[in-house]
C-alpha cells in the first residue's frame, strides 16, 4: 500500500520549510557552521529527538525548530533546505506544495528579509525545474511576536508569495492580536 500511495499525485498545503529538514542536512549544516547546540550529532538519536511527540505540548515539540532555524541563517543553507524539501515532496508523489516559513526568524545573523525570501523563492524556482513539482511560498508571522503587520507587508511586496499565515504557540497568543494583519492579508494576498 505504501508504494501505491507514493504514486498518487498529491497536494501539500501546509508544509513548514524550517520544520522538515533532513536529519543529515541538519547535522551537516551544524558542523559546517560550528553550531554547537544540537542535542546529538548521532543521526538516529537526533532523528528520534526531533520527531513530534503526540503526548507532548506544542511548545515542547517546537523546541526542535530552535535547531533547524539555528542552521538556516545564511542564503546557501536556506536555498539548500528549500531544494531538498521539494525533492523529498516530489519523491513522495507531491505535485503541488505550499512551503511556509517565518522569514523574520532567519535574520539573527544579519540577513535581510529580501535575501531570505529570495533564497526560498530561488530554491522553489530551481526545484520546480529540477523535480517536476509546482510550489509556492507562504510567509508566517509568529503569534508570540508583534510584527505581523511587517510580515503581511512582505507578502504584499513579493509577487512570488502565495499566502500569509500565523504560526507558533497558540496558548496565550490570540489571533485577535493580529487582527489587522489578517485583515490586510485577506484583502491583498
What name fits each language-model region?
Residues 1-186:
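Metal-cofactor-binding active-site regions of metalloenzymes
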Amino acid at each position: 500500500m505504501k508504494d501505491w500511495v507514493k504514486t498518487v499525485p498529491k497536494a501539500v498545503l501546509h508544509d513548514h520549510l524550517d520544520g522538515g529538514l533532513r536529519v543529515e542536512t541538519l547535522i551537516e549544516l551544524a558542523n559546517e557552521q560550528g553550531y554547537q547546540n544540537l542535542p546529538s550529532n548521532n543521526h538516529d538519536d537526533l532523528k528520534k529527538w526531533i520527531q513530534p511527540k503526540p503526548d507532548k505540548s506544542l511548545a515542547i515539540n517546537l523546541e526542535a525548530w530552535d535547531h533547524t532555524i539555528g542552521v538556516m541563517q545564511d542564503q546557501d543553507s536556506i536555498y539548500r533546505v528549500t531544494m531538498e524539501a521539494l525533492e523529498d515532496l516530489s519523491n513522495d508523489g507531491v505535485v503541488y506544495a505550499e512551503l511556509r516559513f517565518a522569514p523574520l526568524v532567519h535574520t539573527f545573523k544579519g540577513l535581510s528579509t529580501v535575501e531570505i525570501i529570495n533564497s526560498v523563492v530561488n530554491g522553489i524556482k530551481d526545484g520546480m525545474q529540477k523535480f517536476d513539482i509546482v510550489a509556492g511560498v507562504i510567509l508566517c508571522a509568529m503569534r508570540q511576536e508583534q510584527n505581523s503587520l511587517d510580515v503581511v507587508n512582505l507578502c504584499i511586496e513579493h509577487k512570488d508569495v502565495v499566502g500569509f499565515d500565523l504560526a507558533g504557540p497558540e496558548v496565550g497568543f490570540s489571533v485577535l492580536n493580529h487582527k489587522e494583519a489578517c485583515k490586510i492579508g485577506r484583502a491583498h494576498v
